[in-house]
Amino acid sequence: MNKIQDELELVLPTPEYKTQVEEYLQEFFDNGEYEIAGDGGLDRIKNFEEWLLKVQKDLSEESIEDNRIPATLYLTVRKSDNRVVGNLQIRHKLNEKLLQYGGHIGDSVRPSERRKGYASWMLNN
């Protein structure tokens, strides 16, 4: 197993990650970045509990908001310090907009953790 594989894991968001997710979001804003790819709307909603509920609803076509498509969002967490270093969203099908501009996968890595191979790892796992 490579070093990055040993360092990281993909996890579904849960209430236990509230502080880590809020710090993750704030780092983007502090870096002047106000749009986060594949974040399930975190950059717009900004409230963890509301965002978590939306992410959970997004899992199923029966509970998703109108004009949305089912998607699974994962947090990329570094095991050694439980730090959220990225996010990965897998969209289970595409609508017209996503066919043109988004695709099946959206991902981001927090600014201070870039250029470490984390995005490549997320896409390969």
At which residue positions do the language-model features occur?
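GNAT-family acyltransferases
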Residues: M1-H104, P111
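Conserved acetyl-CoA-binding loop-helix of GNAT-fold acetyltransferases
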Residues: G106-V109, R115-N125
